[in-house]
Regions:
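Short, small/polar residue-rich loop motifs at catalytic or cofactor-binding pockets
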Residues: 35-37
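Conserved active-site alpha-helix within GNAT-family acetyltransferase domains
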Residues: 92, 96, 102-129
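Conserved acetyl-CoA-binding loop-helix of GNAT-fold acetyltransferases
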Residues: 69, 75-88, 99-100
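Short, P/G- and charge-enriched loop/turn segments at secondary-structure junctions
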Residues: 29-30, 128-136
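Conserved beta-strand in the GNAT
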Residues: 42, 48-56, 61-68
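Short amphipathic alpha-helix that is part of the acyltransferase structural core
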Residues: 1-32, 138-156
Length: 156
């Protein structure tokens, strides 16, 4: 069997249902997907969507907004490719850090470290996900994470 090509492409407005379906299958929230101030990507294998990831942009930092690969495509390093492509995009746009909320995952292996919730809420206060939590007077579940980006050296 030949390996099908994998491509990560910028999500378009018509991809919202696809992104939401992939996120829902992974148990992730779909609120604010593809809103203004965000960038999303769809991963395709053989022309079929198998993953999605998003970034919500703040001033000099971004919030990772979902990283999901369909169960049928897991265990092949595709999730790592998605995350690292988002890290590279954030670095290239000049972000000093990427933050995220997570209920699981081995985020240390991606260079993330746990940080207090106040750090994330304070550094990316205008991102859709943070605004939504504040509007509901709700704390995000799980842990809060940060990955510093060495923009000056061109390394993420």
């Amino acid at each position: 069997m030949t390996e099908q090509s994998v491509q990560i492409r910028l999500a378009q407005p018509q991809d919202k249902d696809t992104v939401c379906r992939i996120f829902q299958e992974a148990g992730l929230e779909t609120e604010a997907a593809l809103e203004a101030g965000t960038t999303y990507w769809v991963m395709e294998r053989g022309g079929q969507p198998v993953g999605a990831i998003g970034l919500e942009h703040g001033e000099g930092a971004s919030l990772l907004r979902g990283a999901a690969v369909l169960p049928s495509a897991q265990g092949q390093g595709l999730g790592r490719r998605l995350v690292m492509s988002a890290v590279e995009y954030a670095r290239a746009r000049g972000d000093r850090a990427i933050y995220m909320f997570s209920r699981g995952g081995d985020w240390h292996s991606f260079g993330f470290t746990q940080v207090p919730l106040a750090v994330v809420m304070g550094d990316v206060p205008d991102t859709p996900q943070v605004r939504a939590y504040r509007a509901r007077s709700e704390r995000p579940g799980g842990s809060t994470w940060m990955r510093a980006l060495d923009v000056a050296a061109g390394k993420a």
